[in-house]
Design a protein with these regions (language model features):
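Sec-dependent N-terminal signal peptides
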Residues: 5-15
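Short pre-active-site segment immediately N-terminal to the catalytic Zn-binding motif
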Residues: 195, 273-296
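Extended acidic/polar, glycine-enriched regions
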Residues: 110-175
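Active-site recognition of the HExxH zinc-binding catalytic motif
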Residues: 291-307
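Fold-level signature of zinc-dependent metallopeptidase catalytic domains
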Residues: 155-211, 224-228
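N-terminal prosegments of processed precursors
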Residues: 22-117
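Active-site-proximal segments of metallohydrolase catalytic domains
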Residues: 219-277
C-alpha cells in the first residue's frame, strides 16, 4: 500500500504543475455537448490520407473531464487537437492509436492501400474552431496531417439515432468525474439474457480484481450495451487477434451512453483479444480472460506496450529503431532518461541480468530486462514479469502510468 501511495503522489505531482499552467476553462469554450467525428483513413506504409465522413451531434452531455482537457502525455501514434479559431489556442487534445498503424507494418500493408474507420468524441465548441488531426513524422514528432475548420453555427450535423440495449452495471457518480467504461456484448440473442447478466458480472469483476483498478473501483462507471460490434478473429493473419474494423457501428451501438473506454465482450470461448490505445479493448470468454482483459485494458487505458517476445509477428522490429518507443513501459535505451531510470534502485545494472528464479506470478525487482515489444533483443522491459508480459500483476512502471491516466478523468 505504501508503494502504491508513493506512485500516486509522484504521478499527481508530475501532472499538477503543467496542468495549472495550461488550464482551459471549459465554460468559456464549450457548450457542454458532445461532437462526434467519424473519420476515414486510407493508405499503406507508403503514405495515407484522412478525412471526415460524418459530423454528428451526439445529443448527449460531454461526459469527459471538464478540467483535464489537455493531454499531458506524448503517447499514441496520432493526436487530435481542437484549436480556437480566434486565438489559435489549443483548447482540447487527446492522443490515440488505430488499426491502420498496425496494418501498415504487415507485409500487405507495406504497399497495398486499405481504408479504416476512426471515431473521435470531442467537446462541442461554442464558436469556430480548427480541428487538427496529427500524426508522427519520421522523427516521431507530432505534425498536422489535416486541419478541419468547424463552425457550430453553420455546420451540417447528423444526429445519433440508435443505440443498443443498455444496462447500468455499476454507476458511482457524475460521468464527468469518473472513468466511464462501456462493455459492448457481442453474440447474445434474446434467449441469453441470463447468461448476459452473468458474463457482464464476470468481466466487471475480472477488471476490478486487479490493481490499480481494484483500488479505483469507486472512480468507475460501468455500462453494458448488447449488440453486434462485428469483432472477428484472425485480424492481420493472427488467429488470436480479435478486433473490429467497424468503429462507426460500434459507436452507433453506444449511442448517448457515457463513454471514455470501450470493452467488447465476445460470447465465444475461443481464446482471443486485442486492444489499441484510446480506441477499444476486446476479450472473448475463454478461461484466460482473467489475464486477457486486464492486459488488453492496459493497452487501451494506459497506452502500455506488450512486454512479451514474438519474433514471428510481422511487426516484431517495431521498436528496434533510432527513436525511443512511445510506450512508457519499454525502452530501446535511445533515451532511457525519459523512461523509468529514475525509479531504479541505486546500482542496478543496465541492462539487468535475467533472474529465471522469479515466479511468473511475481514482478520481481525493478530493472532493465532484455526482451520486450515482441523483440528478443534490443528492447527492454522494467520487470521479469508483468501483466503486460504474462501472469504477474502490473509492475511499478505500468502502475505509475495507469495512476497518471486516472487523474485525467477523476479531477
Amino acid at each position: 500500500m505504501k508503494t502504491r501511495t508513493i506512485i500516486l503522489f509522484l504521478a499527481l505531482l508530475m501532472l499538477g504543475g503543467a496542468a495549472e499552467a495550461q488550464k482551459v476553462r471549459f465554460g468559456k469554450y464549450f457548450t457542454g455537448g458532445t461532437l462526434r467525428l467519424d473519420c476515414s483513413r486510407e493508405g499503406s506504409a507508403e503514405g495515407d490520407s484522412v478525412w471526415v465522413s460524418r459530423w454528428i451531434d451526439r445529443e448527449s452531455a460531454w461526459h469527459g473531464s471538464r478540467t483535464q482537457l489537455l493531454d499531458p502525455f506524448d503517447n499514441g501514434d496520432y493526436r487530435v487537437e481542437m484549436r480556437d479559431a480566434r486565438s489559435g489556442r489549443v483548447i482540447y487534445s487527446r492522443g490515440y492509436s488505430n488499426l491502420f498503424r498496425e496494418y501498415k507494418d504487415t507485409p500487405k500493408g507495406r504497399t497495398v492501400k486499405a481504408r479504416f474507420e476512426e471515431t473521435l468524441l470531442l467537446p462541442m465548441p461554442k464558436r469556430a474552431v480548427n480541428i487538427a488531426l496529427m500524426r508522427r513524422d519520421g522523427q516521431m514528432h507530432l505534425v498536422d496531417q489535416t486541419v478541419l475548420p468547424f463552425d457550430p453555427s453553420t455546420a451540417k450535423l447528423e444526429y445519433s439515432m440508435r443505440q443498443g440495449e443498455r444496462s447500468d452495471l455499476e454507476v458511482h457518480g457524475d460521468p464527468a468525474k469518473k472513468v466511464d467504461v462501456v462493455i459492448v456484448a457481442q453474440g447474445y440473442d434474446d434467449e441469453s439474457d441470463q447468461k448476459l447478466r452473468i458474463d457482464y458480472y464476470r468481466m466487471k469483476e475480472i477488471l476490478f480484481g486487479k490493481e490499480p483498478f481494484a483500488s479505483h473501483r469507486q472512480d468507475f462507471n460501468v455500462y453494458g450495451i448488447k449488440g453486434d460490434a462485428e469483432a472477428q478473429y484472425g485480424t492481420f493473419g493472427a488467429d488470436r487477434y480479435l478486433m473490429t474494423f467497424s468503429l462507426w457501428r460500434l459507436h452507433d451501438l453506444i449511442g448517448m451512453t457515457p463513454c471514455d473506454y470501450i470493452v467488447i465482450m465476445v460470447n465465444n470461448t475461443t481464446y482471443g483479444g486485442g486492444a489499441i490505445y484510446n480506441f477499444y479493448a476486446v476479450s472473448s470468454l475463454h478461461t484466460m480472460a482473467e489475464y486477457v482483459l486486464p492486459h488488453e485494458f492496459g493497452h487501451s487505458f494506459g497506452g502500455l506496450a506488450d512486454e512479451y517476445v514474438d519474433e514471428e509477428l510481422s511487426y516484431s522490429n517495431l521498436h528496434r529503431t533510432a527513436y525511443e518507443p512511445l510506450e512508457p513501459n519499454i525502452t530501446n535505451l535511445t533515451d532511457f532518461d525519459s523512461k523509468w531510470k529514475s525509479l531504479l534502485p541505486q546500482g542496478t545494472p543496465i541492462p539487468t541480468p535475467p533472474n529465471p528464479n522469479t515466479p511468473r506470478t511475481e514482478c520481481g525487482p525493478l530493472g532493465v530486462f532484455e526482451g520486450a515489444g515482441y523483440s528478443a533483443t534490443g528492447v527492454y522491459r522494467p520487470a521479469e514479469h508483468c501483466m503486460m508480459r504474462d501472469y504477474a500483476p502490473f509492475c511499478p512502471v505500468c502502475l505509475k502510468r495507469l495512476e497518471e491516466i486516472f487523474s485525467l478523468y477523476t479531477r
